[in-house]
Amino acid sequence: MIDRRAFLKSLAGLTTGVLLSSACAEGDEENSHSDRLGSLLPTRRFGRTGEAVTMLAVGGWHIGDMDEAEAEKTIETALEGGVRFFDTAEGYQNGGSESRLGKLLVPKYRDDVFLMTKTRARDTNEAWEHLEGSLSRLNTDRLDLWQVHAVRNPADVDERIENGVFDVMIEAKETGKTRYIGFTGHSSPHAHQRVLEKTDIFDACQLSMNLADVSYESFIERVVPTLVERNIGVIGMKALANGGFFGGTQHGRHGPNPKVVPNRVSISEAVRFVWSLPVSTLVTGPDNADQMQEKIDIAKNFTGMADDERQKLIEKVEDMAGTTVEFYKA
């Protein structure tokens, strides 16, 4: 039986390496904190890539979901606040999110940002089709990171490997269509474990990380240690359980959900918990520019968590662990 307190203490200790290496990746600590657009949020080392990425990233699904005027305001707010990592996927709004970034972000800021998208492809042909479509919609000839999107379980992983999807990822990197490759998922840590059993081709991994995760089918416990050991860049997501922490019936799967925020923990505490782990960046999905600014302010004022604070927060939501709050887990 895992000693959770000791495990989290050891894992949190590894965060120092992520933080201290960011300046080295840029070569100069002072220069790593600004670019032509202004001051950056703190940066963190992105695994073995040698990159230093901002600790906060903009979630592309939300950019595609809001109206265009609010999307533009949110993007500009993110850039002004020092965010330089942008997430999207071909499956978000059937390419609508990518098209929006291709219109509002890329023309003016392509060389200033780290641009990532994802593919749900099931076979070789579909993977190439998705890649070319993504590049076209994003209005660019290269990606910074292209990821296998939403691996669900070991069988799903095996199918994508057998059908050549992983081979396409390798070729896309070798031919310069993407600088780095990765994989994502939030259904089951066993899917991620399967990927890591089968291959070591990936530079990055995106996975669910939040206070409730620790107590049920935990990505933090089952996957993150291997990522750190292999020097794979860790991209956190769902710090607020994709809205599950706010309760209500918005997800339509399990009826009324218990409310975690603000009844038990604050948004700041939930986000700080993730940043206190060895994560390179955290993808946040703002519904509007004000929410984007809220996360930026939390990042600017971030301080690490002591072991006791971390454990107390976990215990506050431990009874909510499972698929009601984390509705996306299998």
Identify what each model region corresponds to.
Residues 1-15:
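N-terminal secretory signal peptides and thylakoid transit peptides that target proteins
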Residues 14, 198, 222-330:
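Structured C-terminal cap/extension of enzyme domains
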Residues 23-56, 64, 73:
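C-terminal segment of N-terminal export signals and the immediately downstream linker at the start
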Residues 46, 58, 86, 101, ...:
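Conserved, mostly hydrophobic/aromatic
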Residues 47-50, 102-110, 135-140, 196-199:
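Acidic (Asp/Glu)-rich catalytic clusters
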Residues 59-69, 118-125, 254-262:
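Active-site mouth loops of central-metabolism enzymes
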Residues 88-104, 153:
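Glycine-rich, proline-tolerant flexible connector loops at the mouths of alpha/beta enzymes
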Residues 122-218, 222, 228-235, 290:
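Glycine/proline-rich, positively charged
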